Amino acid sequence: MHTDNTALAESPGPAIDLDSLYAAPAERIQKAVRDRLSDFHEAYLRQASFFCLATAGERGLDASPRGGPPGFVQVLDERTVAFADWPGNNRIESLRNLQADDRLAMLFLFPGLDIFLRINGRGRISTDPHLLQELSEGRGTPKTATVVLVDEVLLHCGKAIHRSGLWNPSSQLDRSALPTVGQMMAALTQLADATAPAMDAAQQEQANAHYAHAVRHDLY
């Protein structure tokens, strides 16, 4: 049973005076926000293997994961970085959003480290053959790349990592504790059409196997 809290989320209410609740950031933190990459930013990017990409479009906002070998986000110069778009679910919300609104944000996580790197900027989609070749992985060449003009870059403290225990081995989830892909597909099929044939256990296991293979091997 879920309580409907829609009104709580949608009702704006009176404006909250945030400055009365939160202290101003320290001067050193404000000065740490730069409009271009420094050598230490580039050092982190050379080791970066995962980030979340936030974009906005006519239909709303999206956040999408991006991953690759260390350095898959290439530094083109102190104001510009680029990364490839590799196969996913083909929803391509981020790409469509960037065609309507070029603003984006990137949040980098570094395995084992308690620090984040953030980039706010503007992105454009490129099909430049030379750039795509530079961003290729093995025998895979991306169809498109996103070129980012950096407006802001900063390192962000990793308190959230410690609050969550993200890198702690004891925090790793037991896969059996949550529904499988096959089980969720079966439920979604019934939610979309109650008259549709239900997926049996064998079909659910087939979906699980297909997903497990795809996320590990169909990378490029």
Place the predicted regions along the sequence by residue:
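Binding-site signature for planar aromatic cofactors or substrates
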Residues: 1-220
